[in-house]
Amino acid sequence: MAKIDASKLELTEKVVHIARVAKVVKGGRRFSFSALVVVGDGQGNVGAGLGKAGEVPEAIRKGMEDAKKNMVSVPLIGTTIPHAILGNYGAGSVLLKPATKGTGVIAGGAVRAVLEAAGVSDILTKSLGSANPHNMVNATMAALKSLKRAEDVAKLRGKTVEEILG
């Protein structure tokens, strides 16, 4: 998979989750913030990143930088994905199913943010297991990374698309 140059893309960013976290030290608690951010161009390129800092804006900025480093390309067929897939990360699993035009994005918060940033506008999803935003975002990213077009699979197997699809 070729590395995506985020500087050449018109990216939209969405903050999925901000958490105030505490480190307990001898003198009490030290608070900092973590921000889970998703960036995408709406044309099949999407990335997710985690930023941590003492202040919220700095955590968001770091999260955006991390997301731009972790961009992946998603094979889209029109406004949906080529086939159903299950993505796993930690205790979170996400089932993604292609949908007909006009269905819309049927997904919960963290999964929806990733899919909208990727440019998927018709899809059915089901979140299984953990509802933790970090796990949901990473499970969705894992599923999107695993998607393959029928043409690519046919080429790998040395067959025609008709033979693959039956």
Swiss-Prot record:
Domain named S5 DRBM: residues: 11-74
GO MF annotation terms: rRNA binding; structural constituent of ribosome
SUPFAM superfamilies: dsRNA-binding domain-like, Ribosomal protein S5 domain 2-like
Transmembrane segments: none
Top-level taxon of the source organism: Bacteria
UniProt key word Glycoprotein: no
UniProt keyword annotations, A-Z: Ribonucleoprotein, Ribosomal protein, RNA-binding, rRNA-binding
UniProt cross-references to InterPro entries, sorted A to Z: Ribosomal_Su5_D2-typ_SF, Ribosomal_uS5, Ribosomal_uS5_bac-type, Ribosomal_uS5_C, Ribosomal_uS5_N, Ribosomal_uS5_N_CS, Ribsml_uS5_D2-typ_fold_subgr
GO BP: translation
GO annotations of cellular component type: small ribosomal subunit
Record's comment describing the protein's domains: The N-terminal domain interacts with the head of the 30S subunit; the C-terminal domain interacts with the body and contacts protein S4. The interaction surface between S4 and S5 is involved in control of translational fidelity.
Family that this chain belongs to: Belongs to the universal ribosomal protein uS5 family.
Protein purpose: With S4 and S12 plays an important role in translational accuracy.
Quaternary context: Part of the 30S ribosomal subunit. Contacts proteins S4 and S8.
PANTHER family for this protein: MITOCHONDRIAL RIBOSOMAL PROTEIN S5
NCBIfam families: rpsE_bact
Name this polypeptide is given: Small ribosomal subunit protein uS5
Natural source organism: Desulfitobacterium hafniense (strain Y51)
Taxonomic lineage from the root: Bacteria, Bacillati, Bacillota, Clostridia, Eubacteriales
Gene name per UniProt: rpsE
